[in-house]
Amino acid sequence: MLRHRLAALFEPRTLAVVSDRPLPVDQSTPALLNNAVTHIPVPDAVADKVPCRLQGLPDGERLDLALVCVPPASTPAVLEALRRYRPRIVLVLAHPEPSDDPTQDTIHCRDWSRRNDCLILGPRSFGVQRPHLGMNLSHHPHGALPGRVALVTQSRSIAAAVLDWAADVSLGFSAVISVGDEGVIDVAEVLDYLSMDPRTDSIALYLEETTSSRRFTSAARAAASVKPLIVLKVEEALDEDPVHVAAFNALLRRVGAVRIRFFVQLFSAIKVLVHTRRPRGKRIALLSNGDGAARLALDVMGTGATVYRAELAAASIEGVGQLLEKGALADNPVVTYAPLTAERMRGLLDILVEDKGVDGVLVLLAPDPLADLESVVDVLAAVAPASRKPIVTCLMGDSSMRRLRHVLDEAGTPAFRTPETAANAFGILAGYHYSQTLAQQILPPEPLSRPPDTDKARQLVQAAQRRGQRVLSPCEGLELLGCFHVPIQLADDVPEGSPVMAIRVRKDPKLGPCMSFGRGLEPFLRAEAAVELPPLNGYLARQLVQRSGYWQGTLSRSLTPVAAEFLREALERISLLVSDVPAIESLDIDPLCLEGDTLVATGLEVKLSSASMLVLPETTGYSHMAIHPYPRHLAQMRQMHDGRPWLLRPIRPEDAEPLQEFVRGLSDESRYMRFVSMLRELTPHMLARYTRIDYHRELALVATINEPNPVHRGHPRERIIGFAHYLRNADGRGAEYALVIGDEWQRCGIGSQLMRMLIEAAQEQRLTYIDGLVLGANRPMLGLMTYLGFRVDSDEEDPSMRRVWLDLGETLG
């Protein structure tokens, strides 16, 4: 099995320690490193008098990890001394002695890393902990308890504070990582590792800034697609550009992460993420021994929170009423004023959990000297962890309630101190589920839109730049929009009675262009505006409109279906424009009005950057954008051996239904050869995984033909007849491919052309090899791979499988 490139950091096999001060690892050596740790005195390292051999390191092998904690002025000499061992990773801890030039320290680490093929975490990292291994490679004096939540932070103080708090409430972690100054290993690379880490069920991230928006976007998307990712990001300054704030919020929403805004919410998130049961919706039932706590929780739910009060079924209300005293509240919130008993708590929980209109239960308890709260908490400790729906508790108070909260914490169910934090924690769980539901939604198929005249648009912009023109005239702006078939016309005046809208584009220095839709003739990013990052498809464009306050208050009633479709198309095509023409600094269509069903603009301004377009964005991977757009330039018409035409193109989210039809249409043998199982159709998760592609790190291609559609009077429809994709391997250097061709289209030359395109794309992404597992009985596939230059090896773990692989360096040569 391939080893992840960060495995040497999180699961090192050999370790060298160079430190001028005591570290926790000196007192407790992890079991996996028994007889494999070498302590090198700092004077020896600085003088390059390091030992020839290290403990547990065979001759000729690389050292996995070096832990360095020395004054910044000594770090370069220590790194040079470590070259002898060719370390895979160096962890540079923060040192009490300040640096004269922190920026130069980081630059030196990057240069040394590049010259020596070695990754560096730091400088000025707080360190790394892997509690299940007993490994504490940090400054924190105590190792965290083992758990299933990973903590990643860019702040040493935040890491220390969270570890101290977690020890007090007996919360554990799968990993704790403080990245420091991100010399080489950054947050994105850590997220990549944690997304595949079997010990990690969820990730809590404290973020101050992102050094590479594209890498962060890609890694966050990969992580959030398989486990909850909670992000606390501080604003970099009190006067931070609101465009960046809105763009970053849009980015997190796009990748499926959940953003929190306050430090106290980080504690709530970490605590609630240990809950193995996740809500399937947003409807919450409240159970309280007094109405004060319930009112506080409802206040939180009523201020734009992710969750809301569930409507109980009539049978549930009747059942609850039979268990409560006269005068109690049986409809949500369920409130009892009599002393609670264990039997009553168990009965109430059973009813609320069984209600189909309830997705989770929030139990709020205040101290009650007349009640046996210990027995009540014992019921919660027994019922909540085993419940099929999440049960979150809030035990208000400290003197008598702290010990009871610890009982629930030890039982593995989160117990909070205030109604606000408990309700917010539920919102975090529900928010993640909601984002994943959206991510797996099957979009209806849509035809590829009419291709734009990109060359003409770029020539228009370049001509203006050569003239020193930074702002296009309205007529030039309209011509630019016309190159991308944006359905908007110019008008002199606002039509009477028309709604006044605005479409705006601004360029964020880190995240690239962001789009806004809302009320016209207002400052950018008014409260009623919604923001999204391009590229947009039809679904995202509709969501952008419908998320705006202007739609909810006015447009939903005044916009006709035809006009709404024109608006959707305009947004989608403007997003394509700013993707393909990076020189656009800003774009304002304000006011945007309606003349009948036609979109007309009485104000149009396009500002250009001063940098000329010498390099086409498709050759740089659209580096000016946080999200890689659909690589339309890869779409090509091809021919089969007999001359029949077919289209080779990258897959889109809208291909989910056609791809499902393709898989259903495969023969049992073809499905088994591809999936090594007898599945008859793809699961929703598999469909989303194969069609919602991160073009920055992977690629999926389809072969399609046009055929008459009997449902629509024989009008042509696109049909998928072949599918190929590759996903990056854990080592970050190669990718695993998969290929399947429809039965009636095999031996037509389609498979070889799809594979050649995959190989070219993998080379452009600087991968060094591409491989895959093929059933030994699949002789046609083995023959094709051999024909394409792949080598065939037996699989060590399964004799029925073959590993086929291609060295892309050799192919390039």
Regions found by a protein language model. Give the residues of each.
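Long, contiguous binding/interaction regions
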Residues: 610-813
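Catalytic-core regions of core metabolic enzymes
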Residues: 1-603
